[in-house]
Amino acid sequence: MEVCITNYGARVVSILVPDRNGKREDVVCGFSTITEYMEQRQNFGSTVGRYIGRILNARFTLDGVEYKLVPNNGKSGHISHGGNPGFADRIWKVEQADTYTVRLSYLSPDGENGFPGNLKVTLVYSLGEDDNAL
């Protein structure tokens, strides 16, 4: 198995696995260039956040404080998948990259898309020793 990761959105770009005849095939849906990922709004292979799903009316209450977020879900006024730009649109810091492991991190600052507090996210992709698990 061969896996390709980019720090743009902490995204899985490709996973090459052998078919029953030994021919390596890419099993990830995506694009050939970073420019294509930037131009398209699909989250193919990316890390989504701060929130997955929709927050109705782009607001929520936490500890008695109402937070108004930046809506990105068309005319509905909702926020989807952490906003725009979200984690999928950010350049993540590569903290480790070797043969079997890639460790990426991103610091989402207080107020990003309206969300409160700093949030440090660390993501580890690790290929198993038998090359059959990611």
Predicted features along the sequence, with ranges:
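Surface-exposed acidic/polar loop and edge beta-strand patches at domain peripheries
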Residues: 1-134
